[in-house]
From Swiss-Prot:
Claim: Transit peptide is one of the keywords in the record: no
GO molecular function: phosphoribosylformylglycinamidine synthase activity
Name of protein: Major tegument protein
Gene Ontology CC annotation, any one: viral tegument
């Protein structure tokens, strides 16, 4: 469908030129969740909104705005048609069929009612639209102005047509209260917004409350120049390096991968470096805020893990609809953040979720608030910077995408992970291309801020000289379109202020010094430009630093100034002064003392409460209940460094107390012995590698332990005590972690306070109390961030402190988790408290009208408990353990029972008041020991003035085992684990109602997850697979190129897997390949990583199109694939699409010959979206057929093994429906999704074991077996310490897993079938 455009005069940022609007329709197969909810409402005869509609029909609606008119010359119309076809190809149109066409399944006539909707065309493009536009720009498209994906649904109406009340329901359920817009015919014919511009406020918001709080904590005028964070921090100068309040923990095993292909002989090294933990708490926080803040502390930091936490008001309201609306808002906001992080290539390893009732203190006025923590690695030399001075260049990294409704459900404007991944890659490459100090400025404001605030933070003195021709393209284009009447100094100043300086954005700003010196033949700007080009990162050299204050703009639009000329003298066309910092007068903060009505030590009358009813309420509360709707739908393991992520046990339940992130995945020999000569591989065979017995060496993995502690409601009740309790929780969460030295534990506090309630003295008192407490705990302390509620208004009394622990750790055996291990063992509890209900506890919130003051335990008792349990863990006595926190003792015990799927019998003394004892939240620990060790444990604890209690016994394993509590002779609770799991998972189920289709939520298979039974027997030997941990020098005869597409991260696991298999691995970026001989020296090609684009299928097809657009890159890859001496492997969504798109897998044909263009339309397969409609991070069984031709999987034929599977589109949909049978007969099926059994025929057909329910094929190989593409990612689990759960058949192994053989087999094959040479 086409509409003729017309010339119009539109406001700034609107496209008013001639254009054609094309509508394409795609049969979606089923309505989305919102459309289903609406249809159920309208079809309910009991509802006042009932319409008696006919069957619901829904489809995708693609709108494409193309430059020009139908009267343009034929060549222009042909090029426009080509670009429109390119859009269709990127979205799945192929030669065998079109997913998008001009014919709609709906017809708005007669009694048919049709409703079209989607993102607002009069607002900035959605994130999905901006990303596809970025792909089109890289592919050279010039006629496509904007693309948006909307929806269209309809039905036949048998009664009257929809009225105002029905339209209200549509607006609420489908349009998310006008977050999306209804599309009327011809609505955008008069113009639309093409640019990403968003008008900021008339003046930048300087956030005086936030600035004041930061000055109190980190120094400034409001604090009288005192830096409390530095005065009160507790660190060891012998073990730490610090910059101000920032504490760096050293490491000697930091993986460093060479980024230049010209590096020879070695591509990997273990270097000295530092680990830094950062974080912040922000209301309505941008999803990836910390990913930009961290470079503001250390510009070359490499994020290796992150953590997320949320605070929400409890979903309450006058009716069910209001509560459902609140739950939906929370579900979509948390999902948007989780998926942004899932696409960033940095795993999320820890988190929390807390709701506070609006009737409670701290709950009133609470805005959605997010904590985002990040663990970063920094190479030693990357800490060096230069002194700030005049004459330095100002650089802006990343596409200019001002914020607009980032957190408004359904979050179409959420941040782009692609943009942030490109910036991080560019900085990493820049540090390698120019390994000398050159960055002079990188500071950022403490919270989300306007561009002008970023520039103010960057400039400690003087000002900036900025050039209009070097501003972002959208801003520059808007200036160029200004008429003569407005193109004056004041007019341009107003435009630049509105559309560049005052909006908030996602860019990273730095200043760099450039002198005459060159490194590797490049100046600083040349190296930075090359790094950005290789990373696919947009960058702008905006101007230079000057002595003249403010922002001085030069109008060089008519004759652009080059970067070399920026240091010359120029007269400003207009100047913008930095906004003045508002000086706040003396205020009278609301006192933080406990209200007079608070009872300090209440006595509860609880005869009307039963343990069962209380436990049901506690377990189903969002603060305690399962967070599987978050944990299983964000990236948990990318990069391969994660040894402990949130999921534990056979059911992958999110119950881990701590995370463990390894610093290196590359193997070393015990005792620091040098690696064996690479010629060792000449004597190896697959049989030797498979049948070899493990060497028995004690393999040690070093890394960082991460935990979180927060007590938001208790902090609101009492700032000092709540802060101490958060510190206690963070410390006890680390009690069972493999920490090297308790004295190396670093506690970092992140403050979220309202200056109108907590003045300078109150903040100082709380920080001083925290410092004293840390000193008593015997741990180090620093302050990471200080933030305040968004408005700084007294209407919101919410305050919180999040404590994070980071500590060097090392392990060589199984990690201690809450998973109960052994039938007949005993459970021991040790607590620091009096057994009464803790003030601010969840029990008190739910069952008492009295808010009592919380009390933290004495530091000495907590220190003794932590160190005693650490000693027991190191001695090997502890089998499992869990901390006592939200929900109290009984919740801790239930969670341990669920994690291990084992029955538990608890015995409470007759004399005790068991109900307060069960729900008291006094900090403590519960751990499992064998009966023979109980005496030793009790003696050890009592010798340190602790009073442990033996609570009960662990029973048999199974979902129908019982959790039982006995009070003397009376059984006060007896429930099956299956029932308790349902109660504990009920909150996640509520959230899933908003996130997943009804057919999935109601499926009988939706809970069929976990209990993976593995069968790993090699047909080569008939023995269980125990691959040898063979550590050799990199073999120059087997060089493997890891191809890194623009916008991707997380390649480290592939690099490590091949390096551990003795190969010489290097990263290769698209822009490095300049001739078709580039890959001639390589025998292996690996494709993987995580692409930051929201649409995984689009990213894969666009990547193939980008390869085809570069003849040198395309021919080099095709030449490589056609060589008989090479192998390739593609892992994950992106890798499978690229290898299939290049013709290497998915059909019985050979790849095209070099010089032949790759036809993206001819791809034999496309990726099918997950049945849940969500990103999935699952630990699933994968079976390898006994007849597969794959050379890499030869040693694993006939095995069933669990593996990590992550992505949004985890199914294969063939364009030729008969192709799966053809491939099966040709032995080109590499693997299948498998059930929880070991029988070869028991393939998984249903979600979640089969994420898409589209067939069961999970991997393919070429006809000769040289090329392999897998949706799962074995590089993430080559070592047993990377596994989510080890099936009992493997015992307690500590070495490499059977998946290692896959990479070793590639090395052996290349030596025997290739043409290796040194």
């Amino acid at each position: 469908m086409e509409e003729r455009g017309r010339e119009t005069q539109m406001p700034v940022a609107r496209y008013g030129g001639p254009f054609i609007m094309v509508r394409l329709f795609g049969q979606d197969g089923e309505a989305n969740i919102q459309e289903q909810r609406l249809y159920e409402l309208l079809s309910d005869p009991r509802s006042a909104l009932g319409l008696d509609p006919g069957p619901l029909i829904a489809e995708n609606l693609l709108l494409v705005a193309l430059r020009g008119t139908n009267n343009d010359p034929r060549p222009q119309r042909q090029e426009r048609a080509r670009e429109l076809a390119l859009v269709g190809i990127l979205l799945g149109n192929g030669e065998q069929g079109e997913h998008l066409g001009t014919e709609s399944a709906l017809e708005a006539s007669g009694n048919n009612y049709v409703y079209a909707y989607g993102p607002d065309w009069m607002a900035r493009p959605s994130t999905w639209s901006a990303e596809i536009q970025q792909f089109l720009r890289l592919l050279g498209a010039t006629y496509v102005l904007r693309v948006e994906m909307g929806r269209q649904f309809g039905f036949e109406v048998h009664r009257s047509r929809p009225s105002f009340r029905q339209f209200q329901a549509i607006n609420h359920l489908v349009l998310f209260d006008n977050a999306l817009r209804k599309y009327d015919s011809g609505q955008v014919a008069a113009g639309f917004q093409r640019a990403l511009l968003v008008a900021g406020p008339e003046t930048a918001d300087t956030r005086p409350d936030l600035r004041k709080l930061n000055e109190w904590v980190f120094g400034g005028r409001a604090a009288g120049g005192r830096q409390l964070a530095d005065e009160l921090k507790i660190v060891s100068a012998l073990r730490d390096t610090y910059s101000g309040h920032l504490v760096l923990q050293p490491t000697e095993t930091l993986d460093t991968w060479k980024v230049l292909s010209r590096d020879t002989r070695t591509a990997h090294s273990l270097e000295h470096g530092f680990i830094h933990a950062a974080g912040t708490i922000q209301a309505n926080c941008p999803q990836l805020f910390m990913r930009r803040q961290h470079p503001g502390l250390f510009p070359f930091v490499n994020a290796i893990a992150s953590s997320l936490g949320w605070y929400y008001q409890t979903a309450t309201g006058p009716g069910a609809d209001a509560r459902a609306a609140a739950r939906r808002q929370q579900a979509f906001q948390t999902r948007a953040a989780a998926e942004c992080h899932a696409k960033s290539g940095v795993p999320v390893v820890a988190g929390f979720y807390r709701t506070i009732n609006a009737t409670l203190k701290g709950g009133e006025g609470l805005q959605p608030t997010m904590f985002n923590g990040e663990l970063g690695a920094i190479k030693h030399q990357a800490l060096d910077t230069v002194r700030y001075d005049y004459g330095h260049y100002l650089i802006m990294l990343g596409p200019f995408q001002p914020w607009s409704g980032l957190t408004a459900p359904p979050c179409p404007y959420a941040e782009s992970s692609w943009a942030q991944a490109a910036v991080q890659t560019a900085l990493e490459l820049f540090s390698a291309l120019y390994p000398a100090p050159c960055i002079s400025g990188y500071a950022r404001p403490p919270g989300p801020s306007a561009v002008i605030e970023h520039l103010r933070s960057l400039v400690p003195k003087g000002g900036l000289l900025l050039f209009l021709s070097h501003l972002p393209d959208d801003v520059k284009d808007g200036l160029g379109e200004m008429g003569p009447a407005r193109a004056t100094g004041p007019g341009m100043q107003q435009f630049v202020g509105s559309y560049f300086l005052n909006p908030a954005c996602s860019n990273v700003f730095i200043t760099v010094r450039q002198r005459g010196e060159k490194i590797n033949g490049r100046t600083v700007l040349q190296a930075l430009g090359r790094a950005c080009d290789m990373a696919g990162c947009q960058h702008y050299v905006l101007g230079s630093t000057v002595p003249l204050g403010g922002l001085n703009f030069v109008n060089d639009l008519a004759s652009p100034v080059s970067t070399a000329e920026m240091m010359d003298d120029f007269s400003p066309f207009f100047t913008v002064e930095f906004p003045p910092i508002q000086e706040e007068g003396a205020s009278s903060p609301v006192p933080l003392d406990v209200d007079e009505s608070m009872d300090i030590s209440p006595s509860y009358e609880l005869p009307w409460l039963s343990l069962e009813s209380c436990l049901t309420s506690i377990l189903s509360h969002p603060t305690v209940g399962s967070k599987e709707h978050l944990v299983r739908h964000t990236d948990r393991v990318s990069g391969g460094r994660v040894a402990q992520q949130p999921g534990v046990g056979p059911l992958d339940l999110p119950l881990a107390d701590y995370a463990f992130v390894a610093h290196s995945q590359v193997w070393t020999r015990p005792g620091g012995a040098p690696p064996l000569p690479y010629r060792t591989w000449d004597r190896m065979t697959e049989k030797l590698l498979v049948s070899a017995k493990p060497g028995g060496e004690n393999v040690k993995v070093s890394g960082t332990v991460i935990t979180l502690g927060e007590q938001g409601y208790k902090v609101s009740l009492d700032l000092r005590e709540g802060t101490r309790l958060a510190m206690a929780e963070a410390l006890l969460n680390a009690a069972f972690a493999p920490i090297l030295d308790p004295e190396d534990v670093l506690l970092t506090l992140h403050l979220h306070l309202d200056p109108s309630r907590a003045d300078n003295s109150a903040v100082m008192e709380a920080m001083t109390a925290a410092s004293d407490y840390a000193r008593g705990l015997g741990v180090k302390l620093t302050f990471g961030s200080a933030s305040c509620p968004e408005t700084g208004s007294s209407a919101s009394s919410f305050m919180t402190v999040v404590a994070s622990v980071s500590a060097p750790g090392e392990f060589s055996g199984p990690l201690i988790t809450p998973v109960l291990q052994k039938t007949g063992s005993l459970l021991i509890a040790v607590r620091c408290g009096d057994g009464k209900i803790q003030g601010g506890s969840l029990f008190e919130q739910l069952f008492s009208d009295v808010a009592t003051t919380p009390r933290a335990p004495e530091a000495l008792s907590l220190k003794n408990l932590f160190r005693a349990v650490q000693q027991l863990v190191k001695s090997g006595i502890v089998l499992s353990g869990h901390d006592i926190s939200d929900g109290g003792l009984v919740t801790c015990l239930v969670e341990m029972a669920l994690a291990g799927q084992r029955g538990v019998t608890i015995t409470m003394p007759v004399a005790s008041d068991y109900l307060p004892e069960m729900f008291a939240e006094h900090p403590g620990l519960v751990f499992e020991v064998e009966e023979r060790s109980v005496g030793e444990v009790l003696q050890t604890l009592r010798s340190m003035n602790m009073y442990p209690a033996v609570l009960g016994r662990v029973g048999e394993q199974g979902p129908d085992q019982m959790f039982e509590v006995q009070h003397g002779p009376e059984t006060v609770l007896r429930q099956s684990l299956r029932l308790l799991l349902g109660t504990w998972s009920s909150f996640a189920s509520e959230q899933y109602e908003c996130l997943r289709p009804d057919r999935i939520n109601r499926s009988m298979h939706v809970s069929d997850y976990g209990y993976n039974e593995a069968l790993a027997v090699s047909p080569l030997t008939g023995k269980n697979l125990s691959p040898r941990r063979l550590v050799t020098e990199p073999d120059p005869r087997c060089q493997v190129a890891v191809l890194c597409a623009p916008g991707t991260r997380g390649h480290e696991s592939l690099l490590a897997a091949f390096t551990n298999a003795g190969c010489l691995c290097r990263r290769v970026f698209f822009r490095e390949v300049r001739d078709n001989t580039f890959l001639d020296k390589y025998v292996g090609l690996a494709i993987g990583g995580v692409h930051g684009a929201r649409d995984s299928a689009l990213a894969g097809r666009a990547t193939v199109a980008l390869i085809n657009r570069s003849p040198a890159l395309r021919d080099a890859i095709l030449k490589f694939l056609n060589r008989p001496d090479t192998f390739s492997v593609a892992l994950g969504e992106l890798g499978v699409q690229v290898l299939a798109g290049l013709g290497a897998v998915g059909s019985t044909d050979n790849p095209p010959a070099p010089g032949v263009e790759v036809n993206v339309q001819r791809s034999p397969l496309i990726l099918a979206p997950n049945a849940s409609g969500m990103f999935e991070s699952r630990w699933l069984n994968i079976s390898i057929p006994a007849t597969t031709s794959s050379v890499m999987l030869r040693g694993l034929r006939g095995c069933v093994l669990p593996c990590w599977v992550q992505g949004s589109c985890l199914g294969l949909q063939f364009t030729n429906l008969g192709m799966p049978y053809v491939l099966q007969n040709a032995h080109q099926i590499a693997c299948h999704f498998h059930s929880n059994g070991t029988d070869a025929w028991r393939f998984a057909m249903n979600y979640p074991r089969n994420p898409t329910e589209q067939g069961n094929i999970a991997g393919l190989c070429s006809r000769d077996g040289r090329h392999l593409a897998l949706l799962c990612d074995p590089s993430l689990c080559t070592d047993f310490w990377q596994w989510e759960h080890i099936p009992p058949a493997f015992g307690h192994p500590t070495g490499c897993s059977p998946w290692t053989l896959m990479f070793q087999a590639a090395h052996l094959w290349s030596l025997r079938h290739g043409r290796p040479s040194e």
